[in-house]
Amino acid sequence: MQLKIYSSNKNYIQRGTKAFTEVTIAFFLAGFSTFSTLYCVQPILFLFSKEFSLNPAQSSLSLSASTAMMAFGMLFTGPLSDSIGRKVVMSSSLFLASFCTFCCSNMNSWESIIFMRALTGLALSGVAAVAMTYLSEEMHPSVLSFSIGLYISGNTIGGFLGRFLSSLFSEYFSWNIALEFISFLAFTSAVLFVYLLPKSKNFCSSPLDLRKILLYFIFQWRDPVLSKLFFMGCILMGSFITLFNYVGYRLISQPFFLGQTTIGLLSIIYLIGVYSSPQAGVLIERYRKGVILTLALTMMIFGVLITQCNIVLLIIVGLTLFAAGFFAAHSVTSTWISQCSKINKGSTSSIYLFSYYLGSSIFGTFSGIFWITEKWLGISIFIITFLCIGILLSIRLLQYKNI
């Protein structure tokens, strides 16, 4: 099988240049558009349950359908970007996702909502699969970890604003108007993204070959380091989505009885990722990645344990610690994937993110069974079990040199 190898003679983007500023702003907008449209339904799952007479596991399908289709789409959009270019794939994805979100806001049956949410996820796969590949190709290696950390920070802010605005508009207007507003912001972000993002200078096109995609998928999973990182992504995102899918159900019920807008404000916790993601990028320049990853996973476990308290302030502390650990761990694994992949970076990133979002879909809905039977304790046991598996994987990764 022929694989594309990238030349070391590249025209990288350096920190402090105009191009660096444009890329930073463009990817912040892409992150906002992607994660606001993807996660705008998460804080209003309770409203879906109420309006369509659904249990929490059924309501979570509005998010799981999107992340499942995003995972599936990334198997093809990454290789597609290897063929036709990074910018065209990302730009098309942003416009299509904003259109699908607008259509979703006008649906009046649960089945049609799920269908449009699935299409939204499929559209967004083009951004999620290609963004880190663009950065790893265009940014100078000395600022790659920092740039990926900033990109993830932008995703964090986008996810926060999408969730908060969705909650706010849903409480004072309706969830339909909330989604319409999100779609308008996403469309505006897409226009600015196209204008700001520089064309790839280090991109080398390779023909699209579906047979090679399948063979490369198998080839990457046989790599002892990459395969563990792929499964790590599944655990990380699955645990994160599970926690925040069901914490709203807990806090909106007795003994807390928090309002919809207040639940949405919990999304501000995600802003801890603005700090923890770049910091993790700095730490892995000084210490072994496996060590930092293990510490981040341990933080997540302690965060879940703290949320067992029936005091709102302590629950917020636990959620914050959990989120900080998650974004640090995601930053480490994202950088790790980029550095381990020396060939066909778009395909490698796609496989990692396929695992990442597939974990979100499976964990996010399947864990609803634990909520139905054991409420918050069941959710916590579910998450901690998989995070412990993640720590075991991280320890195994320490046996490899330079990791």
From Swiss-Prot:
Chief location of this protein within or outside the cell: membrane
Family the entry assigns: Belongs to the major facilitator superfamily.
One GO CC term, this protein: plasma membrane
A Gene Ontology molecular function term of the record: transmembrane transporter activity
Keywords associated with the record: Cell membrane, Membrane, Transmembrane, Transmembrane helix, Transport
Source organism superkingdom: Bacteria
Localisation per UniProt entry: Cell membrane
PANTHER family: BLL2771 PROTEIN, INNER MEMBRANE TRANSPORT PROTEIN YNFM
Pfam families according to UniProt: MFS_1
TM annotation in the entry: 25-47, 62-81, 88-110, 114-136, 143-165, 175-197, 229-251, 256-278, 290-307, 311-330, 350-372, 376-398
InterPro entries listed in its UniProt record: MFS (IPR011701), MFS_dom (IPR020846), MFS_trans_sf (IPR036259), Sugar_transporter_CS (IPR005829)
The keyword tRNA processing belongs to this UniProt entry's keyword annotation: no
Protein name per UniProt: Uncharacterized transporter bbp_532
